[in-house]
């Protein structure tokens, strides 16, 4: 039952993050949908982790070159997701208020993704690996 509560909490926080992102795009003062391109960064951020988990066999090792490279790529993706709305606001494509809402949405969504892997990445009975 604890896994179901965690899944509901993660889906709720993901919905809050997407709400911030949509507010940054759809409010009448902002009205520009360029910040929706950060959804691409949200979708591809777990891919390096999936690849490293599939390729790396020794999960008890303290360090693995493949895992470190996956962390590096994931960090680059997350930094790009936070930098993209700032660049759009800097060149006056979007307003700074929309940038703030998109950055808040990014923070909530990436914390939700991290929480998902912390909760369901343990390999216990209620794990994301079984889905």
Curated annotation (Swiss-Prot):
Q: Where are the transmembrane segments?
A: 7-27, 32-52, 69-89, 100-120
InterPro entries per UniProt: Vps55/LEPROT (IPR007262)
**GO molecular function ontology, one term from the record:** signaling receptor binding
| Keywords associated with the record | Endosome, Golgi apparatus, Membrane, Transmembrane, Transmembrane helix
One GO biological process term is: negative regulation of growth hormone receptor signaling pathway
This protein's assembly is summarised as: Interacts with LEPR. Interacts with RAB13.
Q: What is this protein called?
A: Leptin receptor gene-related protein
**Organism of derivation:** Homo sapiens (Human)
Q: What is the lineage of its organism?
A: Eukaryota, Metazoa, Chordata, Craniata, Vertebrata
State the gene name recorded for this protein: LEPROT
């Amino acid at each position: 039952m604890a896994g179901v509560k965690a899944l509901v909490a993660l889906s709720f926080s993901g919905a809050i993050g997407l709400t911030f992102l949509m507010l940054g795009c759809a409010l009448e003062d902002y009205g520009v949908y360029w910040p929706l391109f950060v959804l691409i960064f949200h979708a591809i951020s777990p891919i390096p982790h999936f690849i490293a988990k599939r390729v790396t066999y020794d999960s008890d090792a303290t360090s693995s070159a493949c895992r470190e490279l996956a962390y590096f790529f994931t960090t680059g993706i997350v930094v790009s997701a936070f930098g993209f709305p700032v660049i759009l606001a800097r060149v006056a494509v979007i307003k700074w208020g929309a940038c703030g809402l998109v950055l808040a949405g990014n923070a909530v969504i990436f914390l939700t993704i991290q929480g998902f892997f912390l909760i369901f990445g343990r390999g216990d009975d209620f794990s994301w690996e079984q889905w």
